């Protein structure tokens, strides 16, 4: 305890000052961990605060080490045998190490975290997305964030967004609707401007090897800057895809988050894996491996294939698995997990994530995410067969269903349809007009959002 050695040796003023400083620091830490705990996450996404905290921790560590050394000096007898001096010096070194290393680790972690934060999230002035901190959502009842899973494998040119989900979040309650579009959606209209001028009757792709699927839009924009004039490289794809999906769903798209699917495996590994229930055998990889049914802890590679595999399945079934995987990761990314793998998670996030969410919006999003985790209703609606057919989609119906989903009572949800996730049929599902093998008519497609809790075992 700071100051005790000074009191013992009669240095009462210095001892009082050190003790008061020690008590003040301890009280501040205790208050932060208890009374102001909810404010910590708000502060933890502000780079300026993190920079000051890192510097403060360095200063604290230096002062603490100096206090330990000085306390030993004033308590040490003037005459001591050499062996006693050596033993005392060793004890002081151990004490300095004991107090200095945790503080140094905390300062380093804060620096690493700030570096990752500023690398992933640019300021509003940098990306042209100014945020009013008094009204971060501009009075909007919902904030709509496009979640993209990008596949940039070595055998592909550029990025293919094989996973596309619009998360529409109520800014008051945190109730969330996940609207998922299949990667192979065709004949969709392009947004007004150069893109529609290029494709007046819907997107047809870039040459004979590209049939004009929704997952091609991102890379098409990157390779053809004239369809998104004035937008820099690596931002053209997100901008055109946001505008395209906004037109398909009839909903505003505020921001996007892109996750590289292969870097995603690094994040899962840094978390120590993700626990999930596998409901059926899932073949994966090139060596004939299979994820067996049951409750399992998947490593990064297994989690990646759980969300990507289409063998003996379909795009639509894996879309349902992807939602369950997203839910499991969000629930299991607890503070203890984050702290124990901090450096690995930060490095993986820098390699894996891209977004146009400005830094200034992060405090409001953290507050909103707490509402989502604290009992908000999360529902999912997938525009897949037999509800919507990718090769001949009814865009008027898509827009109506999307509007109904975000405006409906979040507690009036339907049960998951048999054979798939939120409208996703199993691999052997019949067409809507054909009878099942037993002669009965197949169930009608579910046109209402399904509770993610009910859909994911």
How would you describe each model-predicted region?
Residues 81-112:
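Internal/C-terminal transmembrane anchor helices
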Residues 107-457:
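Non-catalytic, solvent-exposed segments at the cell envelope interface
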Residues 1-28, 32-35:
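Membrane-anchoring hydrophobic segments
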Residues 21-75:
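Membrane-embedded alpha-helical segments of integral membrane proteins
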Residues 15, 47-57, 82-89:
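Membrane-water interface of alpha-helical transmembrane segments
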Residues 5-13, 64-86:
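Cytoplasmic membrane-interface segments at the C-terminal ends of transmembrane helices
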